[in-house]
Amino acid sequence: MKAETTTGVEELLNELVGRAAGEVGLILFSLGIEGEFTDDQLSLELGIEINEIRKALFALYEIGLADYVRRRDDETGWMEYYWRINYDKALDVLKRELEKTAKKLREKIEAETSTIYYICPNMCVKVSYNDAMELNFTCPRCGAMLDYLDCSKAIEKIEEEVRRIEEILESLDKNSG
């Protein structure tokens, strides 16, 4: 799967993995490991603390890019985790995360367009019109008069981001279908 992806998709996947699992997660994902492995093996081979490896693997698991099975070690009796990176699910995970982001952005647009906001000129607070009325249009922290906040530019930027995500999703659907 890794060889077939475009540079843009790889960049998006790397951004997603980095955000979810940090630098160690990005290292693990970029290794292209086939088959099962243990966190102990990776820790020894990569020289990275086992707790960092585990943290990254569980973060990858949380977003669906890794799976594990637990097996008892016959010699020690301890439970061991055998991990697998789900490269074959990467595009689906990326699509799902992009769709979640677009949904959150649409909700933000809805909130910004359905509410009138006022802001302190000293950037202490941002409050709704109703809250501003209760405060007599005075900042509760510094006492400055609250100013009307024009959210139109912010809304435009959010809408632009939603369009960009929708274009990416459309492109992913065309390339994977």
UniProtKB/Swiss-Prot annotation:
The keyword Transcription applies. InterPro entries: TF_E_archaea (IPR016481), TFE (IPR039997), TFIIE/TFIIEa_HTH (IPR017919), TFIIE_asu (IPR002853), TFIIEa/SarR/Rpc3_HTH_dom (IPR024550), WH-like_DNA-bd_sf (IPR036388), WH_DNA-bd_sf (IPR036390), Znf_TFIIB (IPR013137). The keyword Transmembrane helix does not apply. PROSITE patterns: HTH_TFE_IIE (PS51344). Residues 9-91 form the HTH TFE/IIEalpha-type domain. GO terms for molecular function: DNA binding. It comes from the Archaea. One of its GO terms (biological process) is regulation of DNA-templated transcription. SUPFAM superfamilies: Winged helix' DNA-binding domain (SSF46785). Keywords: DNA-binding, Transcription, Transcription regulation. It holds the Pfam family Zn_Ribbon_TF. Belongs to the TFE family. Transcription factor that plays a role in the activation of archaeal genes transcribed by RNA polymerase. Facilitates transcription initiation by enhancing TATA-box recognition by TATA-box-binding protein (Tbp), and transcription factor B (Tfb) and RNA polymerase recruitment. Not absolutely required for transcription in vitro, but particularly important in cases where Tbp or Tfb function is not optimal. It dynamically alters the nucleic acid-binding properties of RNA polymerases by stabilizing the initiation complex and destabilizing elongation complexes. The winged helix domain is involved in binding to DNA in the preinitiation complex. Monomer. Interaction with RNA polymerase subunits RpoF and RpoE is necessary for Tfe stimulatory transcription activity. Able to interact with Tbp and RNA polymerase in the absence of DNA promoter. Interacts both with the preinitiation and elongation complexes. This is Transcription factor E.
